Amino acid sequence: MVTFLTKQRAEQLVGTKIKNLDLYQRAFTHKSALKEYEQFTESFETLEFIGDSVLGFVITKFLFDRHESKQEGFLTKARTKLVRGETLAKIAEKLNLNALVIMDEKGLRNNWNNNPKILEDVFEALIGAIYMDLGLLHAKEFILRIYQDPKFVDMNSIMVDDNFKDKLMRHCQIQNWPLPEYRVAAHHEGLFYIDIHINDGFVSRGVAKSKKQAEQNAAQSYFQVQEELKNYNFN
């Protein structure tokens, strides 16, 4: 059953009074609905494009203000985590935006309103609607209210620097060691087995479906082993 957006529901989502309800309804209108409902003439795609830009800008400024002393690489990685599709889809799910998506009968029957990509798009479109209706300040307030609420975003886990390859490279430089070499030990049944060698000596192995992730896992494994050795009682 299709649920059309009410002004009360829109204002509950945004957290303030709105001006143009049609903008918010468009934010939840999938292009498949345009043929089925003659009252809808535009889908969320344009608003999603605008919202994507606004979200990126606000999160970039937010990270810079809070972590100005951090290196650019860390800030870039943190921003990527905060605006990636997986994060946005989870936020949209927790906001119950799936119940507001308007699409054709086939889409609803196949539960496409719960598709992570569509949830990501409608969240960005909602931000776009707020920006177009109320301006950047209200869009920023909405975004930061969501992102600073641990119910929606686990900021602590996202802000952890989990680029273990970079960490290992810096570790080697501090120790005046040669840089680590990542060697493909095997590629079997869709899994990459990556070995790390430092100064021609094997130090750790990582396994994953992608070569890139296997390298990260191998670097992480190195630090895990070092931590275990440090805490081990040899007596």
Write out the residue ranges for each language-model feature.
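Double-stranded RNA-binding/processing signature
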Residues: 1-235
